[in-house]
Amino acid sequence: MKKNIFINIFIIVLSLFPAVVGLAGPVDVAKAKELARKYISSPVSVAETSDGFMAKSRRYSDDSPALHMFNNQNGEGFVIVAADDRVGGVLGYSDKGSLDTQNMPAPLMALLTDYTRAVEAVRVDSISVTPYYVKPPKAFVKPLVSAEWSQDYPYNYYTPRSSTSGKPTYTGCTITAMAQVLFAHRWPKMRPEGVIRGEGAMAYDYYDWDNMLDSYSGGGYSEAQGQAVGVLMRDLGKLAQATYGVNGTLCDEGKLWNALQYYYNCSVRQLEKDRLPGGEFLQAIYQELSLGCPVFMTGGDHAFLYDGYDENGLVHVNWGWAGLDNGYFDINTAATAVTTKIR
């Protein structure tokens, strides 16, 4: 029996679709707060520092903000609003956590940069952004991935230590993202032949899915629970020939796809957005999410997951940073590109 998994293996940033400019333009803080209140009760502007992300239009003469970002003063949650309604209204939101410009997943930082470029484009070139309209198969899909995993302990329980410093190495964002997809499917049941055996959970010939937790943040987990997720991470890294490091772990996506096909009984095909007409790429994402298949994304040095969408078509993103800044985002304004499907 083969398992359905949906994977995206590359990202191309920012695809804009010019349209006739209507009666639209800048969105001030007051109007942005009004939009934000639909998602959080008491929006307060996210503090920006010289060391953090400055969502400013570098080419706009009055240096007005490209984005308005708000946290919920009375609880958890955040909202990101475009400062020009020719780009769109709410670009991202979450009912959990809060945005910290100095502690943000790198792929989210890249997405905010793409949003900023979109606003720059409409301001400088006086165009409006009209993303392709795609109707999802279902009204919405709740997040399919319950895991909020990361790259450090206990996920790196069995990763090799540095040969020079003896320090533990990271699992790598690619391995963590794919491990979360496999966890969502609880697939495979048995560990592949040929992986290194050892003591404890490493001696098992199966994956101990029942002992893996949605989150290990804050501690409170048992040794067996830590080992269970560590085995999955180590097997994926080993089979994909990951290059481990104390500052970061690299993984060739092609080798990971080969490992998934050969060891995990999956088949892989690739779709490139630039070669697809209209909104076919976005439709493919909606379709797979509607079938219960998380979408794996990677581009540059980052990997993360699409695992749901809301009534407005914003896609839920799991950044792979232990749940940090997970939320719903507009992936149509800052368009993305290459997709791979694993069966």
Where are these regions (language model features)?
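Bacterial N-terminal signal peptides
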Residues: 8-19
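Boundary at the C-terminal end of the N-terminal hydrophobic targeting segment
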Residues: 18, 22-26
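Low-complexity, Gly/Ser/Thr/Pro-rich intrinsically disordered linker/tail segments
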Residues: 334-343
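Short, non-transmembrane alpha-helical segments in secretory-pathway proteins
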Residues: 25-59
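Active-site-adjacent structural segments surrounding the nucleophilic cysteine of cysteine proteases
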Residues: 87-247
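Catalytic Cys-His active-site segments of thiol-dependent hydrolases/isopeptidases
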Residues: 82-84, 88-98, 312-331
